[in-house]
């Protein structure tokens, strides 16, 4: 069709068909089974000759059919079975199969039923066997191997016609064994079974193709095992691995002679072979005892190896090493037992489970948990010293472990903090051992630990409820009665675990509460002075301790009002303050601007009035009301100034104003008590107090600037308009963020006056750190334009003047109050405009001011 001539192909040389096919890669079988099994040794294979004849076209010469192979002797079959059970890759390098624990456990499943029958028969039947003298020389594992070989021989007798069925059953057997071995984490056994499974699959494929499969090459059946390690097996000796030496009588040899010989091992001389029956029986019993001991040792060694493997898989390397060391000791004992030396099993280690329980119990005994504190622990000084050292040691270890955990998690700050606390505990332990006095109150207690011996009263601070109950007891004893003996109350020891007063309360319970509350504040100051803290650290410690006590008192008041949620909230804040106190003690200062502010006082509902407007009343009731209002006003000022200095981080001024606020509150309580009793008002007077305050407009944010147009003064009127007919309004323009996009607005129109009162506020958006804003503040300002409002379409709005305000003072002040001149072009008009500009705080520094105020003080006027 394409121009080719149909010609006769060149004839191929005769007899070259098979060679050409092989050159082209045809009829070449690279199957893995042939590579693994090899070519059969029989050169006269009829199937191969028939196939060759079909390929070459030559008639096959008929040859006499070879005779079948003679069956192999039992000794060779037994040897082949043992070779099949051996790992061909050399992974399990065991020279002696009799000591392989894994193979013993595997064979144990195969011959389990026979062993049960043997255990039910008395041991004397074994002695009556004609081969008793031979079995005496073998151990029980050898008998198990022989019985398994017998079963394997039985399984090897496969009918000729059921080869495919046998291979399929054998493959199913191996697959089940592989799955069970993988579930039991026996990787070596699983790999060995997988190699046998590959061989079986190759044989099955060869059998399906019609090729001959040699029965002797079929891998023997294996024990499927069990999918999980059961607590007890059919072999009774496994029970002995879970018992002590006293349970060794439960070994399968249950005869009295075996027990006697186990307790008293026979002398090696008595094991000499003799011809009389008594000597044979004695040697047999001794051999059985050795077999039992060896079985127990092998099983116990296997248990420890399995326990080491499980510990390694769970990541407990130390426990795995310990179990492996114990299992190696069993090898030494087994060698001694095989050499004929007597072995005492009384010191044999217990099972891994019992060993773990014993180790745990020994740890509990070595490190007992501290007993709960008792009421008379301070009286037993001899026992308290030891328990105190133990408690300190436990807490030091706890902080060391916490530091290690923090390091491992990457939290270096927390790790350093825990290390400092651990060092503090270490110094305390050294001082305690040296007999020096130590202050246990400054040691932080780790969470979950009981209080140190001798410090039981701090247990009440462990939880919110206990702290509130203790504080409530203090409050109840303070308000029961008015008449009291003050000296008797002062005689109470301050270090009582539960400071309850059995005497009547003072006349002024508020003062006693305050004194009770201020006592713990002085203790940390004393400790700080003993440890020579720097002045800044000591100042912050006093401030934080005082703030903590205030929150605890607020929690007490909330508890008395049955407001448990508020009380718990205050106690949580007190605990966070304790963390800050520990941080300051460790040498790191805190930012007091982030310290929680003073707790809100719900009893401070009042209306602030100016005391200049109050006239001195004649009635005592009016005097009480006036004093209460003034004290509330002073208290509010102190709290406001304290918050301002807290934001600045000034500890000294913050503490000063907080103390002044406490004095005002105490005076209010005195007035309330006196008024309730119907007494005359206590003496009082006014003093001029100089206060250093910081001006902060807290209602503004850092991105806001407030512009207030207050009023206009004598604004000029346009021509033709009388001053009283001026309808003026003010426009302003603030050139930020840019001159092209300024912020601008205007006021309302105030009609018929040239001195309008506007009092209008405008919030402007700013960015304090922006260079453009700073340039506007320094060089420009805010421009104002005053307009006269026109009427309808007759007149338009007419400008009557302009003014501007410089803002450079905002760098050092938070408020500018200016009365600026109104100009008509460059000509002054005589009118003025009052303007206020406010920031939250100055751009640079703080707006500190010194003011003098009249301060109400309760008491007589001091004499000069």
UniProtKB/Swiss-Prot annotation:
Region Disordered: what ranges? 82-154, 218-249, 441-463, 478-502
What InterPro entries does the record tag this protein with? C2_dom, C2_domain_sf, C2_Freud, CC2D1A/B, CC2D1A/B_DM14
GO process terms (BP): regulation of transcription by RNA polymerase II
List the GO molecular function terms.
DNA-binding transcription factor activity, RNA polymerase II-specific; DNA-binding transcription repressor activity, RNA polymerase II-specific; RNA polymerase II cis-regulatory region sequence-specific DNA binding
Q: Pinpoint the C2 domain residues.
A: 685-820
Q: Which residues form a coiled coil?
A: 91-118, 162-209, 385-412, 464-488, 535-564
Any GO CC annotation of this UniProt entry? nucleus
Bias-annotated ranges (Pro residues): 444-453
| Comp. bias regions, Acidic residues | 89-104, 111-129
Keyword list, A-Z: Coiled coil
What Pfam family does this protein match (any one)? C2
Compositionally biased, Polar residues: which spans? 142-154
Q: Which residues form the signal peptide?
A: none
- Locate the compositionally biased regions of type Low complexity: 229-241
Q: Which family does it belong to?
A: Belongs to the CC2D1 family.
Q: What is this protein called?
A: Coiled-coil and C2 domain-containing protein 1B
């Amino acid at each position: 069709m394409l121009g080719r001539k149909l010609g006769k192909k060149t004839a191929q040389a005769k007899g070259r068909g098979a060679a050409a096919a092989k050159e082209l890669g045809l009829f070449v079988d690279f199957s893995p089974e042939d590579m693994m099994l090899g070519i059969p040794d029989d050169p006269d294979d009829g199937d191969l000759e028939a196939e060759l004849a079909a390929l070459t076209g030559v008639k096959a010469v008929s040859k006499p059919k070879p005779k079948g192979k003679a069956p192999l002797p039992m000794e060779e079959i037994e040897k082949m079975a043992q070779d099949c059970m051996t790992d061909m890759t050399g992974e399990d390098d065991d020279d002696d199969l009799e000591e392989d624990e894994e193979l013993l456990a595997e064979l144990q499943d195969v011959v389990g039923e026979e062993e049960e029958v043997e255990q039910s028969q008395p041991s004397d039947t074994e002695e009556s066997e004609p081969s008793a003298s031979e079995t005496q020389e073998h151990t029980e594992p050898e008998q198990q191997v022989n019985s398994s070989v017998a079963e394997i021989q039985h399984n090897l007798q496969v009918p000729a016609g059921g080869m495919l069925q046998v291979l399929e059953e054998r493959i199913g057997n191996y697959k089940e064994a592989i799955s069970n071995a993988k579930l039991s984490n026996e990787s070596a056994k699983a790999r060995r079974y997988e190699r046998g499974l590959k061989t079986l699959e190759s044989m099955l494929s060869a059998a399906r193709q019609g090729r001959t499969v040699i029965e002797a090459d079929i891998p023997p059946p294996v024990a499927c095992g069990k999918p999980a390690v059961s607590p007890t097996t059919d072999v009774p000796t496994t029970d002995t691995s879970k018992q002590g030496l006293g349970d060794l009588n439960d070994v399968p040899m249950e005869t009295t002679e075996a027990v006697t010989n186990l307790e008293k091992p026979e002398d090696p001389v008595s094991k000499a072979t003799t011809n009389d029956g008594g000597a044979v029986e004695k040697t047999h019993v001794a051999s059985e005892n050795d077999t039992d001991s060896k079985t127990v040792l092998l099983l116990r060694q296997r248990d420890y190896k399995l326990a080491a493997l499980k510990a390694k898989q769970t990541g407990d390397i130390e426990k795995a090493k310990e179990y492996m060391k114990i299992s190696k000791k069993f090898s030494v004992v087994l060698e001694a037992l095989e050499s004929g030396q007597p072995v005492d099993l009384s010191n044999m280690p217990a099972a891994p489970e019992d060993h773990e329980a014993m180790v745990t119990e020994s740890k509990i005994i070595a490190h007992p948990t501290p007993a709960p504190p008792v009421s008379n622990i301070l009286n037993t000084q001899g026992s308290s010293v030891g328990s105190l050292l133990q408690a300190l040691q436990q807490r030091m270890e706890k902080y060391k472990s916490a530091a290690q955990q923090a390091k491992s998690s990457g939290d270096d700050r927390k790790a350093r903090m825990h290390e400092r606390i651990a060092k503090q505990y270490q110094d305390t332990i050294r001082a305690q051992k040296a007999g020096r006095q130590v202050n246990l109150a400054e040691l932080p207690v780790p969470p979950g630990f009981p209080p140190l011996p001798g410090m039981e009263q701090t247990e009440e601070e462990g939880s919110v409820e206990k702290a509130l109950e203790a504080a409530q007891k203090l409050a109840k004893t303070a308000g029961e009665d008015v008449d009291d003996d003050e000296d008797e109350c002062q005689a109470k020891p301050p270090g009582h675990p539960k400071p309850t007063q059995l005497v009547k309360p003072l006349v002024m319970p508020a003062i006693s509460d305050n004194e009770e509350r201020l006592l713990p504040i002085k203790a940390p100051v004393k400790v700080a002075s003993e440890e020579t803290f720097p002045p800044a650290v000591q100042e912050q410690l006093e401030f934080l301790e005082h703030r903590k006590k205030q929150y605890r008192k607020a929690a007490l008041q909330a508890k008395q009002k049955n407001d448990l949620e508020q009380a718990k909230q205050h106690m949580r804040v007190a605990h966070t303050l304790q963390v800050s106190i520990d941080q300051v003690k460790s040498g790191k200062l805190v930012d007091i601007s982030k310290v929680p502010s003073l707790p809100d006082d719900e009893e401070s509902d009042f209306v602030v009035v100016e005391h200049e407007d109050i006239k001195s009343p004649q009635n005592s009731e009016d005097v009480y009301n006036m004093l209460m209002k003034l004290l509330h006003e002073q208290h509010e000022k102190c709290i406001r100034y304290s918050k301002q200095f807290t934001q600045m981080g000034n500890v000294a001024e913050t503490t000063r104003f907080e103390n002044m606020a406490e004095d005002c509150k105490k005076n209010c309580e005195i007035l309330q008590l006196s008024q309730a009793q119907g007494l005359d008002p206590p003496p009082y007077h006014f003093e001029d107090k100089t206060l250093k305050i910081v001006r902060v407009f807290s209602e503004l944010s850092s991105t806001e600037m407030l512009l207030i147009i207050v009023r206009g003064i004598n604004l000029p009127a346009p021509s033709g308009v009388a001053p009283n007919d001026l309808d003026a309004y003010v426009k302003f323009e603030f050139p930020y963020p840019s001159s092209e996009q300024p912020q601008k607005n205007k006021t309302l129109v105030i009609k018929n006056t040239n001195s309008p009162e506007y009092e209008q506020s405008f919030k402007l958006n700013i960015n304090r750190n922006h260079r453009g804003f700073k340039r506007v503040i320094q060089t420009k300002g805010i421009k104002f334009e005053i307009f006269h409002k026109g009427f309808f379409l007759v007149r338009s709005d007419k400008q009557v003047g302009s003014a501007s305000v410089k803002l450079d003072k905002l760098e050092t002040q938070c408020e500018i109050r200016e009365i600026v001149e109104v100009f008509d072009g460059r000509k002054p008009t005589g009118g003025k405009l009052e303007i206020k500009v406010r920031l939250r705080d100055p751009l640079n520094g703080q707006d500190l001011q010194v003011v003098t105020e009249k301060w109400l003080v309760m008491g007589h006027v001091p004499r000069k």
